[in-house]
Amino acid sequence: MQSVPFFNTIMTYHEILKTYWGYDNFRGIQEDIIRSIGSGHDTLGLMPTGGGKSITFQVPALAKEGICIVITPLIALMKDQVRNLRERGIKALAIYSGMTREEIVVALENCIFGDFKFLYISPERLGTEIFQTKLRRMNVSMICVDESHCISQWGYDFRPAYLQISEIRKMLPGVPVLALTATATPEVVEDIRRQLGFKEDSRTYQMSFERKNLAYIIRPTEDKEEELLHILRKTEGSAIVYTRNRRRTREVTELLTQQGITATFYHAGLNNDVKDQRQKSWIENEHRVMVATNAFGMGIDKPDVRIVIHMDMPDSPEAYFQEAGRAGRDGQKAFAVLLFGKRDKTTLDKRISDTFPEKDYIRDVYEHINYYFQMAMGDGLGCTFAFDLDEFCRNFKHFPVQADSALKILTRAGYLEYTDEQDNTSRLIFTLHRDELYRLQEYDADTEKLINVILRSYTGLFTDYANISEDTLAVRTGLTRQQVYDTLIMLTRRRILHYIPGRKTPYIIYTRERMEKDWIVLSREVYEDRRESYAKRIKAMTDYATDEETCRSRMLLHYFGEKDIADCGQCDVCVKKRKERASKPAPSLTLKERVIALLSQTPYPAIEVAKKLDADREEVDELLASLISEEIIRTNEGILSI
């Protein structure tokens, strides 16, 4: 394993790329972005899914002294990138919702004293006192804002926590910011620059979102399951099938399996070990099809996906473009197919009312949350609770979809912080020094075996928390999972290590003290403007699915602000037009065109022209007289020529 040279001033960007990633050259606009942020300019990079965004901040950060702060809402992605960086010998760590205060303190101290190059952090952690206190002591080289469209209230995935980034900028006024996104309309681009406080010398780089190898197809059907089977039988290669909910992932997987198509499913409700195993089996082509909710796909490295099929309509062109774009990253021919039925438009329209329930309903949900947690008036500020949405809805007679939406709106309004399910892996750190650990002679055989297996299986256990798997430790030690758990709890009580069992639960944090529900203010910016923007995206998605005259690729690119784009020639609309042109008989030539064509080949006697063309003699004579007078043809003793 390589270690990162301290302060890589002697390494060029290309040397860093070659040393740690093995590539000789950058792709597309990667180098432009790297040189811009490396020179200290605030920079915005717009790159399509699969465009290599991570390289644009990882390479310049390695060329600078200090640590790069990477802000991202995607916990699974930050864990994956931290793991990949560590495998390359690059010191990186992550702080996200669900970590204990002790874990966070250890991580932040490592950022100050441990020569780490990257700190990945979720936006919700930016406003905490402990982070801001420690941040002032860090040597920060640059800030990277991933998924930067989340800072814009006009974006399809606005997250209020992103607005705290502007406060971080005030604390680090000389530190440049790199904002990255794969989906942003022109309106959102301007909002990103404004919200992040970009300086006058800032720069923006944009790759075209056009995917020349990807054919977009709308398939109208009232029997989506049968159409899905038909498509998968007619095509070859790895596939992703997106469904709207978790239940459907299982149902579709069972259907495909029954029909002899190898498939597995994935959604946020599965535990990490199951997710990892299924993802691995799909990547290694043990299963041809991954059936998933939109929880799947971010950061997945599988370039040979040949087809992405949507069983249900996404909420926006942004979401569809990102998910469809997971096909054909290897540059080979690929397909993105959306199955569209008559009922889909009605379903989309209903999503508006489900996503933005009435304000009085939202206030009722707030009051019921307080009852659920038995929160007294004026109390609650800073309190965190594990939360079971299904139980809450059963107790207070709510529909889960609407209650979930109400809680998200209350989060945007600043009254609560509600997160979906967090699947946090078990972690541990040794609290004794390595020498002290070996001096202790009071372990039984099973405990000693477990400690030795842990030390052989994981690294960095004396300086940072490491993710562990009780199942893996059970296999390697020959103990049961329960024995592993009990032993780790015992070692924690004896202060030999600190073990945090994995847990999987959503949670709610009170960001303000409890108040009367009638005092809840849902501003136009939080509610009406967001609802209107959401409705526009729904309409844009419906227009995309129902327009039978405009090239699909051109429609998507136009939505993202790219003008004067040629038809792709491969979507269902373009193919249909090409077939229609091919099926039409060649238009018949006019009599004038036939006369000129005849005389262009050879001079001809005037009296023979009508007979040769099998045309009316009178009509031909009249036409010949006109062409002679216009000097289009010449006559010489009754012989006509051009």
Language model regions located:
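C-terminal accessory region of SF2 helicases/translocases
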Residues: 287, 305, 309, 313-322, ...
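Short, Lys/Arg-enriched, disordered terminal segments
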Residues: 1-12, 582-590
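Helicase motor core with emphasis on the C-terminal RecA-like subdomain
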Residues: 3-20, 24, 28, 32-54, ...
